[in-house]
Structures are given as structure tokens and as C-alpha cells.
Amino acid sequence: MRRTVSRKMGAGALVVGVAMGVYVGGTVGAIVGVLLAMIGFQALTRGVEGRPYIVTGLLTTAGLALIAWAHGLDAPEVGLGRSTWVHGIAIAVGIVVVVGVVIGIAGSIPRLQHLFADERITEVSGLETTRKALLDIPFGTVLIEEFAFRGVLLALGDVLWPLPWAVVWTSVLFGLWHISPALEMHDSHQATQGSSWTTVVGTVIFTGLSGVGFAILRLWTGSLFPPAALHWAANGTGVVVGWFVHRRLRRRTEYDPVGEREDPGHTD
């Protein structure tokens, strides 16, 4: 019942946010509309996976694009200018390869495997893991977050403040955006111990700093593709490697050669 109410409120916030962003004049009105739509998206998709999550992410991204269009932002200003597609995609591919190799190596080191011990993927099948890595994360998480924080909000912030302050501001928002996911991670990840608020504060700081890095990469390349690729590679590869780590650890636990041996001196 509570989750149903939360989703209804989220849907309302999403619709109102897009409408406000489109029809309310001024940059501040656009920013408030984007933030309200993002809050609505998070409330609407809490605990949701698969097609509903992806569709909601795509629709919300379309709503943010309407806000950007209504306030005169063009494709280059949000990191999607055609002139940047080729080199942006080339850099993105290189990032995916490098990050994938690094995370894969980290997952093979026993001392680092606890970093991938997420109970949310313990009982998940390989097919579900693949879907999450190739569909849910890129189209339901990365797309909307990068377009919102490194695309629309960064461009709108650049209108109000000097660019460095726009980077700081959007990165702080990106960190705060991860409060709810941090609480979920605390209950399911073996690498998080102690108070839940320790996890939240650590996550907000880490993702906020990551947001600065994503924004710098976006501005340096002029393209939204490289930060999106880095974001997806880190999350998607982490899920896949985590799944393999869980399988390996489970096999070690289930296989007990000592227990399987029979004592030759024992007779019934």
C-alpha cells in the first residue's frame, strides 16, 4: 500500500515537473522542473526492474529533453552535438574496454572480491544479470542520470553561474541523488558495515566526486557519450563481475572434499 502511494506521488511529481519545466519561464523554473521530475522518477521506479524501469527512464528522459528544448538549449549545449559523435563514441569505446579490464582483474583478486559481494545478485540468473547490465543500467539508469546532470542541468547551471560553479552544483546534486540507493546498498552489500548513515555519507561524497569527474570528461570531450560510457562500464561491469564472484564463492562453499571422504577405518 505504501509503495503504491509512493509511486502515485512519484508519477504526479514527474508529470508536474515536466509541465513546470516546459511552461514556467526562466532558468530557475526549468531547474526546479527537472529536479521535480527526477524526484518523481526515483519514487516511481523504487524496487522496479526490467521493462517498466527502462520505459519509465526513457519517458522521463524525453520529458527532460522537452524542458531543454522549451528553454532554447540545443544539442551541443547538452553534449549531443553531431560534430562530437565520432570522437565521443571512439573515446567511449576505449573507456568501456579499459574499465572492463580493470574491474575484471579486480574481481579475480581474492582480497578485493568482497567489494562485489552484493546480495541483490546472489540468486539472480545469468540472463537477468545480462539484462540488467545491457538494458536496465544503460537505458534506465545511465541515460537519465547523464542527460539530467551532465546534460540539461549542467547547461542550465552554466546560464546562472560560472561554469566551475555549475560543475560543483550539479555534482553535489548527483551525490544527494544517491542517498536512497545508498540505503538499499547498505542492507545488501557485504562491503558496507556499521551505521547506515556512514554508508550514505560515504556514497554521497564518492558519487559527488565522481560527478565532478564525469562533468570534466563531458566538457573536455564536448560529448555526453564518454561520461555515459564510464558510468555504464563501472556499474554494468561491476554487476557482471559480482555475479561471477558470487558463483565462484558459492561453488567453493558447496564443495567440501573433506566432508565427502569416507573414513576407511569406519565400519557400520
Q: Residues of each region from the PLM?
A:
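Short, Lys/Arg-rich, polar N-terminal cytosolic tail immediately upstream
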Residues: 1-15
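Alpha-helical transmembrane segments in multi-pass membrane proteins
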Residues: 8, 22-76, 87, 91, ...
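Residue-level signature of transmembrane alpha-helical entry/exit and packing/kink sites
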Residues: 10-11, 27-34, 53-57, 87-92, ...
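Structural signal for membrane-spanning alpha-helices in multi-pass inner-membrane proteins
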Residues: 38-45, 63-72, 102-107, 178, ...
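Membrane-interface helix termini and inter-helical loops of multi-pass transporters
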Residues: 74-81, 111-121, 154, 190
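Helix-boundary and loop/linker segments of multi-pass membrane transporters
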Residues: 80-82, 121-129, 159-161
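Transmembrane helix-loop-helix hairpins at the membrane interface
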Residues: 128-268
